[in-house]
């Protein structure tokens, strides 16, 4: 923040850089723990008892959530000042919150790794307000309180920025999504003793995040980048955004019912959940049409080709992961057999990567050259390396999804469909899936190589040369 950056419209946008950098560091950690878990699937005692599978999985999923949150916050700190046409309300507050959130995140992960979970719960006085022990919400209560404090400070900062500046559809949708993210997280503090009731409130956090308000955040970030790289009129893009978020909210909120099939809810949810969750691919399909339409109607050739590729890629991959693979097992008669199988893991991996990891990397790809003082785009070599990273990660994730899908089909065929006496046991079924898990691990290694390419592209210091017209002859 101390040095002037001529490539930023507002100097306070520079606070986004540490958020983006830390997000990518956590992303590397998530992938590494994913590879460890992938190997533990086929080499059961790998790193045991130093790093049990359940601990590796907890770190893997928590890193996913936290790095995406850092990415969303960095995106907001970059786009909100530009959309509001004014400086960020308090850059100093943004930096303070960064260090608070980063410290809380690192300490929590270290706690998972070096302290037995029961001891961690006792150490952090979970008995005063029990919130621990649930998937994705394993954080100690003190960490959850810290997340709420950081979220409130963050929303105050960008909210005050919006109030004193211009109001646009993009910034309003982004703010709505971020407020929803904070509000729905509050359900994490309610942990009823009744397991059926607990599952309802757990899904109010998990589902209404990833299939609800996070889609608003994704839509706003995508719209912002497309405005910048295509030059299409803002009014056209905003109309598309209205349609997309309306579909996302209607299908996403009522579509929560597909999680109510087997947790003790009334039978009507078998129909409601199936019908509305079958409509959930629509907003993702609309995003594909939106991105392709805007690129075809572009009024300028933006020099950052890599960012444009990420913008299109995130819509297509999100539609495949969240739309196609989500629909595969969302209808109640099908979900009866597929629930909790490797097919669920296939959907989860491609959906999270396509919808949220890729949109954060899209934003970083667009913003980082400016944040690093390089102008609109890095040089051609850096972009080639980044494009290699895009294709390696995306193809590898699709391969991971296909291998997990094959594993899920075999698992369902051997373990779920046969009658009780003929069904194969869980562990015996797992032995039959080893080939798919080995292939998944190999694809994961290529994914890591792609991520390294993406990160290495930012080490290039070159920039796109500016062509200056020669002076006219006298």
UniProtKB/Swiss-Prot annotation:
Stated name of the protein: Nitric oxide reductase subunit B
What are the leading ranks of the lineage?
A: Bacteria, Pseudomonadati, Pseudomonadota, Gammaproteobacteria, Pseudomonadales
Look up the record and report any one GO term of the cellular component aspect.
plasma membrane
- What membrane topology is annotated for this entry? Multi-pass membrane protein
Assigned protein family: Belongs to the heme-copper respiratory oxidase family.
Annotated function? Component of the anaerobic respiratory chain that transforms nitrate to dinitrogen (denitrification). NorB is the catalytic subunit of the enzyme complex. Shows proton pump activity across the membrane in denitrifying bacterial cells. The mononitrogen reduction is probably coupled to electron transport phosphorylation.
**Which Gene Ontology BP terms does the record give?**
aerobic respiration; denitrification pathway; electron transport coupled proton transport; respiratory electron transport chain
Gene Ontology MF term list: cytochrome-c oxidase activity; heme binding; metal ion binding; nitric oxide reductase activity
- Residues given in the record as heme b 1; low-spin binding sites: 60, 349
Record-annotated membrane-spanning stretches: 19-39, 61-81, 95-115, 145-165, 169-189, 207-227, 243-263, 270-290, 308-328, 348-368, 390-410, 433-453
Entry-linked Pfam families: COX1
State the source organism's domain of life.
Bacteria
Q: In which pathway does it act?
A: Nitrogen metabolism; nitrate reduction (denitrification); dinitrogen from nitrate: step 3/4
């Amino acid at each position: 923040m101390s040095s002037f950056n001529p490539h930023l419209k507002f100097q306070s946008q520079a606070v986004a850089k540490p958020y983006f950098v830390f997000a990518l560091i956590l992303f590397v950690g998530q992938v590494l723990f994913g590879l460890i878990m992938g190997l533990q699937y086929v080499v059961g005692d790998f790193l045991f008892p130093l790093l049990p599978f359940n601990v590796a999985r907890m770190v893997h999923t928590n890193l996913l959530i936290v790095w995406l949150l850092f990415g969303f916050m960095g995106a907001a700190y970059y786009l909100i000042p530009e959309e509001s046409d004014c400086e960020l309300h308090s850059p100093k507050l943004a930096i303070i919150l960064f260090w608070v959130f980063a410290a809380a995140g690192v300490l929590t992960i270290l706690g998972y790794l070096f302290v037995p979970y029961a001891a961690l719960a006792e150490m952090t006085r979970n008995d005063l307000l029990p919130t621990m022990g649930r998937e994705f919400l394993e954080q100690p209560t003190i960490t959850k309180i810290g997340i709420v404090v950081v979220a409130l400070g963050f929303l105050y900062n960008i909210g005050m920025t919006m109030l004193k500046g211009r109001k646009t559809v993009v910034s309003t949708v982004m703010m709505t999504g971020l407020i929803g993210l904070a509000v729905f997280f509050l359900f994490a503090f309610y942990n009823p003793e009744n397991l059926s009731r607990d599952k309802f409130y757990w899904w109010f956090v998990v589902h209404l995040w990833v299939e609800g308000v996070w889609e608003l955040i994704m839509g706003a970030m995508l719209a912002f980048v497309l405005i910048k790289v295509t030059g299409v009129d803002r009014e056209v893009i905003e109309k598309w955004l209205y349609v997309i978020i309306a579909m996302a909210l209607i299908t996403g909120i009522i579509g929560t019912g597909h999680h109510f099939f087997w947790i003790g809810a009334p039978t009507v949810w078998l129909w409601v959940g199936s019908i509305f969750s079958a409509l959930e691919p629509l907003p993702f399909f609309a995003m594909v049409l939106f991105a392709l339409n805007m690129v075809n109607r572009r009024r300028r050739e933006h020099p950052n080709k890599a960012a444009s590729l990420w913008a299109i890629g995130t819509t297509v991959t999100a539609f495949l992961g969240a739309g196609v693979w989500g629909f595969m097992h969302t209808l109640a008669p099908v979900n009866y057999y597929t629930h909790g199988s490797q097919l669920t893991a296939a959907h989860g991996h491609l959906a999270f990567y396509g919808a949220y990891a890729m949109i954060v990397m899209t934003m970083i790809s667009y913003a980082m050259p400016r944040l690093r003082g390089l102008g609109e785009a890095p040089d051609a070599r850096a972009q080639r390396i980044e494009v290699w990273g895009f294709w390696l990660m995306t193809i590898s994730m699709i391969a991971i999804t296909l291998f997990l899908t094959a594993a899920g089909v075999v698992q369902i065929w051997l373990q779920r469909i046969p009658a009780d006496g003929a069904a194969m046991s869980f562990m015996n079924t797992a032995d039959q899936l080893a080939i798919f898990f080995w292939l998944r691990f190999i694809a994961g290694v290529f994914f890591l190589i792609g991520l390294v390419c993406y990160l290495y592209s930012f080490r290039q210091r070159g920039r796109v040369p500016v062509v200056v017209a020669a002076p006219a002859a006298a």
